[in-house]
Amino acid sequence: LRPDRATIVYSNRAREAFGADVPIIIGGLEASLRRFAHYDYWDDKVRRSILVDSGADMLVYGMAEYAEREIARRLKKKIPVSEMRDIRGTAFLAHDAAECEFDSVTLPSFADVCDSKRFYADATRIEYAEHDPVRGRALIQEHDGRYLIVNPPAMPLETKELDRVAELTYTKQYQPMYEPLGGVPAI
């Protein structure tokens, strides 16, 4: 079965197995929703960005079609992930907030959102306000001396690109673990 906080667990295991030479890029729903300091119901406390706890090199959020293609193109050219600071729909940790390559807004720090519900609410309000692919800015949040830099969201797909995605041969199968429950009726 899948462990709790699977992205953190698997990312750390991959780092142990492959070392620092292999870039680890996390994405998906868990990474997207936990990219900023966030409230965790299991621990009943505010946790750091999943990027901090996972030890990954980069986080891709949202649908990520553009970001994944651009990252793959650059990796093919042997460009290190540490130099991929300008890709929309991605996030990374930096030692200096000046490493952000977009117009940006600074959020209350991890320490501040842990200590104050008001700061937590302010950070959440800003995150939502800036989550617009056309006018959204990068968001910066300090985490224990490092800076989480979340680049603006990716631009939406054009009609032809969206059609190509819709035409992919999806299996439309549910996870086998749902078999004893009779499957997933919606599929």
Named regions from a protein language model:
Residues A121-I187:
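N-terminal [4Fe-4S]-dependent radical SAM core
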Residues L1-H143, V150-N151:
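Glycine-rich beta-alpha loop elements in corrinoid/cobalamin-binding modules
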